[in-house]
Amino acid sequence: MQLAERHIIKSTEHRFTQIDELAFKSKNLYNAANYVIRQSFVYGSGYINYNEMNRLMKSHQAYKVLPAKVSQQILMILDKNWKSFFEAVKAYKVDSSKFTGRPKQPQYKDKVKGRNILVYTIQAISSKQLKKGIIAFFKKVRYEFWPGKLDNTGFMYTSSIWEPLYQAFGY
C-alpha cells in the first residue's frame, strides 16, 4: 500500500517565499533545458536524452542554484515529457481518431507566473535529520513526518498554496 502525507503552506507563512523562489528557479531550469531540446529537435540534430542534457546543463546557472539531485529530477521530468510526446505522436500516426488533434511538444512554463515542481529524492535529504523523523529541505524549511519507508518528497503548487508531498511505502 502507498501512503502520502500532505502539509499545506499558505502564502502568509515565511516558508512560502523560500519554496516559491526555488520553484521559480526550477521553472528556469525546465525552460532552459526545454529550449535546448526544442532547438536540437527542430533543426534536425535529433532528440537530446536525459544523460546528455544533464551533462550540458551542469554548467548552466539555473542548474547550479538548485541542489544537484533536485536539478537532475527536473531534467528527468522533462525527459519523461518528451518521451511521452514521441509516444503520443506514434500513437497518433497509427490511429488519429483517438486524439482531438496532433500532439504538441512540451511547452515552456510562463516566464513570470510559472513555477515548477520540486522533487527531493531520499538522497537529497539530510540522513541525520531523516532518522529523527524530520525532513530538512533547506534552511528554515523542516517538516516532521510520519515514520515509515520514505520514497520521494516534493513541493507542488496549487492556487497560492505549496503542498509538501511525502510518499511512504510499506504501511
Predicted region positions:
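Nucleic-acid substrate recognition interfaces
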Residues: 1-171
